[in-house]
């Protein structure tokens, strides 16, 4: 069939769109703003024939540009007509010079093609599609499609000059149709003139003769096979052409074949950009757009699995009704396929496509390229009319069997040129999958549910002071401030302050004291003139008044805090006094406790005689003061006397926690009365009998941290229990405060969780807020010697003060209680997956390591770490990850771990099972850290759900077992 006298042959090189794994990934309507990738035009040949009446074949015209309503349309009777070819057709009739010229012409335009946005498509076109022909029955619609005519036979354009360049300037629109959609689509086949009303037999012959023949790069064929196929192709061409015709229309052009890399640029974009660009996607299109970027054959237990059954497109509604024999249909030979009715041929192709799509990684696609056409219908329409002429038609069928050669697959012949990183990833996946098939899933040994603790008995864990070294003589130094007379320090005696007389420093390196001479306050004299007066004198005058009602206390506090008279709220204090306390308790409060508190507060210049340094960031400094001095400072905090500590934002102390108790007095929270009970218990105790001990506050800032990947230290011992508490059962150990970076958190406001509770029952911790700047990532605060004054029950809203507590812990040589508390602040994670990011895990490791490390102290002199679910709860941390991080940090610091799960018996068993699993296999800190990194890379980095499918501990079990099995297998092969 020639082009006819009315049309001079023109040369045209159609291009194939970038292949993706999703059938709809190349749909121009659904996924705009895509860039196409093309390869060497030598990769494939294609043959086209153009009907004589085609308007695109007018002499002097290169073809219709995008948007033309008269683009070329190919005739196609059935989907199986594309599968009737036997073997692979090749014809190299062009000379070497012609090929070089063509390649140069094609390659010159490849860069411009890549720069264009391939899917520059307006979403509105989806709404302007042609209306469906709904008046026909489903049978007529299906038959009409399957028996449709091709309105333009495929031929080669043979015009020279700039025809090809002009055609390539207009970017073709691309729509991908999968086989199940072919069975439902009803393409308008209106002929251009009567010359195209051929019979069905002629259509079949034309379809077989003028099919697009693609030179497939992966076909490993000899030169003789190629020559034989070339001869066969020429023979077919001579049969179909007139004897006098030069067969020029049967010559083949080379086109660009895009390798079907599973991780190509377009494929990787489809998942993320498809739903965003088209909010009006149909059900089927949305499903296609969300298909995985790559597919692989792997075991379900693999941590790198992609569940294609959830992401890939499922059967359409029409197919679901006609697929009861889905798994029983097989492809026959090409002759059997040709003899089947076209409807069953389409169904066979559909079934084979879906079967292979779910099990194979290779891909072949049916891919249509359109040039022109003003409207496109949805991909899931039963009858889709495509107005205009289709100028190029490329068909790519995913996972269909080779249609010409029995028992061969078309994917065996398609070129695949994956990127280097794709190849590495596929190699790793293959290795991982093979390993996984051999390794049974590890199941931790069964643990009795009756066990209340697991691991090393707590009696064997080291405690202070028995494990500690003898302390040196207490004396002040450049990095240690001591506020008492060390030469007069005696057990059971109240330490004497040092120096004897008050020394004042009003600068940015020390706490600004209420009794400072620089603490001035504007006052009015008898003449009404304002002058600067001593605020300390005003404080003394206000507090020395008797308090019989809560209103009296409120007025006294506001007298020297006039600026906050309309801002501060005393509702909680008033309700506590009037509604919570009984009459006798209220009377004891205002007759005894409050006057004693005023007395110790106003004795501040005589008790705290030395300026208190600020523990700023990057400082390694300690402050040792007496419990009496702390009591005086806390009494001043209760009466809100500390200057410059109430302003917010960019004030002088904005990087320090609140110290004045004004926020404790506000609101109607049910927590406030219990907090006030706990604090008044402390003040009653210290005013009735002066405490005799010392307390040391140490800010520790580290610069050098372990290289966690290379840390070869083994894991230390573990005791884990769901009973008990850190403060009760961790006596003599390093007790972890799950701190806020502003130490104390909400202790002076509404907070009432682990840190706030600890600061309430050990109120001497609260004074650290006076001089401790916000903690940096490499810093911690260590407090040694605080005393517990109260017992409690509950937690948060259920917290209740129970009774006064007599602390029976021993004292060291510095007269400090052997209670060492370390405040380490965890990160706050709003997204669960964020905590598995390597930088975040490293930060948490460094923070815990900073709190656990004691430079210069050997491991046998270090007590065990008593800790629990640090950074969990409101901070969003995963308890199992945090437990592992603390175990690693303690091992690096050479400390044992006593872990309290606070009633969670399942967590207790999980932590113990993981610890025993790692220690039995002699894994080091670095080994476990690498597993954490691997978990992030394989499970969390590309996770699109709130949490990974595989949890951390099962992943570690499997990874370690897989590695051990691989090592054993390698040893057996090498004979070692």
Swiss-Prot record:
- Provide the active-site residues from the annotation: 737, 755-756
Question: Acidic residues composition bias: which ranges?
Answer: 316-331
Tissue specificity here reads:
Ubiquitously expressed.
Q: What is the effect of changing residue 756 to A?
A: Abolished poly(ADP-ribose) glycohydrolase activity
The record lists the effect of residue 756 to N as: Reduces hydrolase activity
Identify the stretch(es) annotated as A-domain. 1-456
State the EC number(s): 3.2.1.143
Q: Which Pfam families match?
A: PARG_cat_C, PARG_cat_N
**Keywords on this record?**
Acetylation, Cytoplasm, DNA damage, Hydrolase, Mitochondrion, Nucleus, Phosphoprotein
Give the residue ranges for region: Disordered: 1-69, 183-350
Question: Where does the record place a coiled coil?
Answer: none
Q: Which domain of life is it from?
A: Eukaryota
Location of N6-acetyllysine modifications: 340
> What does the UniProt function comment say about this protein?
Poly(ADP-ribose) glycohydrolase that degrades poly(ADP-ribose) by hydrolyzing the ribose-ribose bonds present in poly(ADP-ribose). PARG acts both as an endo- and exoglycosidase, releasing poly(ADP-ribose) of different length as well as ADP-ribose monomers. It is however unable to cleave the ester bond between the terminal ADP-ribose and ADP-ribosylated residues, leaving proteins that are mono-ADP-ribosylated. Poly(ADP-ribose) is synthesized after DNA damage is only present transiently and is rapidly degraded by PARG.
Q: Which family does it belong to?
A: Belongs to the poly(ADP-ribose) glycohydrolase family.
Write the protein's name.
Answer: Poly(ADP-ribose) glycohydrolase
Q: Which organism is it from?
A: Homo sapiens (Human)
The gene that this protein is the product of is: PARG
């Amino acid at each position: 069939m020639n082009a006819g006298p009315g049309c001079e042959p023109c040369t045209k090189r159609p291009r194939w769109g970038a292949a993706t794994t999703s059938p709809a990934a190349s749909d121009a309507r659904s996924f705009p703003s895509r860039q196409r990738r093309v390869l060497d035009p030598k990769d494939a040949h294609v043959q086209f024939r153009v009907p004589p009446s085609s308007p695109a074949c007018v002499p002097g015209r290169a073809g219709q540009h995008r948007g033309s309503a008269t683009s070329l349309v190919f005739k196609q009777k059935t989907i199986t007509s594309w599968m009737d070819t036997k073997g692979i057709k090749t014809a190299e009739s062009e000379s070497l010079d012609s090929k070089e010229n063509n390649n140069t012409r094609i390659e010159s335009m490849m860069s411009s093609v890549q720069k264009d946005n391939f899917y520059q498509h307006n979403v509105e076109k989806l709404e302007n599609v042609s209306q469906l022909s709904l008046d026909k029955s489903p049978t007529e619609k299906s038959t009409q499609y399957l028996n449709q005519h091709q309105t333009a036979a495929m031929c080669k354009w043979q015009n020279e000059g700039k025809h090809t360049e002009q055609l390539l300037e207009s970017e073709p629109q691309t729509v991908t149709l999968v086989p199940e959609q072919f069975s439902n689509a009803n393409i308008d086949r209106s002929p251009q003139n009567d010359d195209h009303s051929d019979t069905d037999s002629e259509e079949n012959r034309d379809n077989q003769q003028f099919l697009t023949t693609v030179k497939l790069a992966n076909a490993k064929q000899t030169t003789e096979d190629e020559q034989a196929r070339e001869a066969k192709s020429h023979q077919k061409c001579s049969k179909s052409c007139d004897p006098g015709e030069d067969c020029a229309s049967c010559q083949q052009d080379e086109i660009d074949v895009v390798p079907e890399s599973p991780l190509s640029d377009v494929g990787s974009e489809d998942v993320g950009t498809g739903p965003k660009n088209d909010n009006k996607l149909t059900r089927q299109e949305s499903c296609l757009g969300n298909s995985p970027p790559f597919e692989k054959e792997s075991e379900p237990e693999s941590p790198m699995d992609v569940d294609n059954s959830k992401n890939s497109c499922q059967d359409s509604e029409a197919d679901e009704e006609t697929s009861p024999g889905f798994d029983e249909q097989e492809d026959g030979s090409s002759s059997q396929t040709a003899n089947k009715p076209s409807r069953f041929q389409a169904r066979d192709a559909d079934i084979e496509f879906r079967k292979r799509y779910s099990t194979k990684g290779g891909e072949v696609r049916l891919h249509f390229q359109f040039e022109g056409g003003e409207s496109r219908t949805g991909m899931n329409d039963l009858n889709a009319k495509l107005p205009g002429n289709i100028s190029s038609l490329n068909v790519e069928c995913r996972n269909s069997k080779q249609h010409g050669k029995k028992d061969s697959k078309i994917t065996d012949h398609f070129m695949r040129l994956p990127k280097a990183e794709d190849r590495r990833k596929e190699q790793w996946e293959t290795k991982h999958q093979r390993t996984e098939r051999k390794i049974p899933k590890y199941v931790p040994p069964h643990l009795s549910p009756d066990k209340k603790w697991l691991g090393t008995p707590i009696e064997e864990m080291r405690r202070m002071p028995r494990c500690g070294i003898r302390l040196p003589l207490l004396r002040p130094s450049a990095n240690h401030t001591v506020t008492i007379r060390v030469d007069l320090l005696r057990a059971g005696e109240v330490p004497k302050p040092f120096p004897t007389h008050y020394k004042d420093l009003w600068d940015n390196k020390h706490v600004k004291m209420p009794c400072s001479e620089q603490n001035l306050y504007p006052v009015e004299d008898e003449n009404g003139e304002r002058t600067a007066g001593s605020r300390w004198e005003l404080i003394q005058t206000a507090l020395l008044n008797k308090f019989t009602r809560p209103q009296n206390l409120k007025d006294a506090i506001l007298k020297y805090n006039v600026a906050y008279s309309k801002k501060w709220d005393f509702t909680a204090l008033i309700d506590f006094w009037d509604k919570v306390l009984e009459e006798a308790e209220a009377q004891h409060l205002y007759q005894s406790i409050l006057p004693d508190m005023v007395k110790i507060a106003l004795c501040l210049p005589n008790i705290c005689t030395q300026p208190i340094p600020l523990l700023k960031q990057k400082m390694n400094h300690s402050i040792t003061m007496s419990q009496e001095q702390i009591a005086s400072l806390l009494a001043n905090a209760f009466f809100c006397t500390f200057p410059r500590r109430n302003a917010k934002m960019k004030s002088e102390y904005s990087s320090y926690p609140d110290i004045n108790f004004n926020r404790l007095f506000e609101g109607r929270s049910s927590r406030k009365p219990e907090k006030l009970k706990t604090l008044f218990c402390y003040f009653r105790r210290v005013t009735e009998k002066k405490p005799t001990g010392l307390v040391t506050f140490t800010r520790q800032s580290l610069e050098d941290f372990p290289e966690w990947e290379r840390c070869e230290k083994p894991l230390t011992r573990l005791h884990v229990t769901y009973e008990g508490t850190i403060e009760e059962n961790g006596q003599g150990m390093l007790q972890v405060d799950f701190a806020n970076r502003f130490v104390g958190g909400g202790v002076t406001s509404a907070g009432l969780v682990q840190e706030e509770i600890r600061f309430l029952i050990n109120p001497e911790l609260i004074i650290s807020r006076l001089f401790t700047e916000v903690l940096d990532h490499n810093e911690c605060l260590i407090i040694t010697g605080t005393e517990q004054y109260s017992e409690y029950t509950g937690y948060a809203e259920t917290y209740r003060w129970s009774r006064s507590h007599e602390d029976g812990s021993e004292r060291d040589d510095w007269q400090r209680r052997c209670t060492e508390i370390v405040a380490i602040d965890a990160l706050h994670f709003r997204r669960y997956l964020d905590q598995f990011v390597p930088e975040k895990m490293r930060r948490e490791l460094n923070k815990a390591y900073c709190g656990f490390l004691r430079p210069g102290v050997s491991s046998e002199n270090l007590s065990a770490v008593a800790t629990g679910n640090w950074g969990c709860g409101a901070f969003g941390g995963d308890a199992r990850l945090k437990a592992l991080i603390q175990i690693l940090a303690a091992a690096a610091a050479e400390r044992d771990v006593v872990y309290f799960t606070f009633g969670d018996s399942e967590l207790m068993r999980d932590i113990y099972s993981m610890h025993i699993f790692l220690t039995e296999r002699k894994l080091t800190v670095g080994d476990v850290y690498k597993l954490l990194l691997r978990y992030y890379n394989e499970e969390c980095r590309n996770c699109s759900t709130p949490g990974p499918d595989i949890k951390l501990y099962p992943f570690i079990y499997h990874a370690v077992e897989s590695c051990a099995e691989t090592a054993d297998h390698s040893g057996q092969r090498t004979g070692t």
